[in-house]
UniProtKB/Swiss-Prot annotation:
Organism (species): Vibrio cholerae
Function per UniProt: Light-emitting reaction in luminous bacteria.
SUPFAM superfamilies, alphabetized: Bacterial luciferase-like (SSF51679)
One GO-annotated biological process of the protein: bioluminescence
EC number annotated for this UniProt entry: 1.14.14.3
One annotated GO molecular function: alkanal monooxygenase (FMN-linked) activity
Protein known as: Alkanal monooxygenase alpha chain
Keyword Oxidoreductase recorded: yes
Subunit structure: Heterodimer of an alpha and a beta chain.
Taxonomy of the source species: Bacteria, Pseudomonadati, Pseudomonadota, Gammaproteobacteria, Vibrionales
Amino acid sequence: INTHEKKAQLDLYNEIALEHGHDIQNIDHCLSYITSVDHDSQRAKDICRQFLAHWYDSYVNATRIFDDSDQTKGYDFNKGQWRDFVLKGHRDTNRRIDYSYEI
């Protein structure tokens, strides 16, 4: 993702942390990434795609549980990405993964 999108994600993270009473200057932070290392770069990419597909499918299932509300603010960013994706005429998870790579 580009610098503007990274900043937007960090701003959202900070906003949610502050809303829950955390001092964002004095807490430990952790980032996680889906990665793979392989001599065959296509195989490494395919492995990551499988995990990313599972993550997106889990997101779809989770959003069926929650209604839009302030309590699901963390989902709003991803819901917005899904809306943009669907408005572009895409519907399947593999195409959503391709869209993520384009970002």
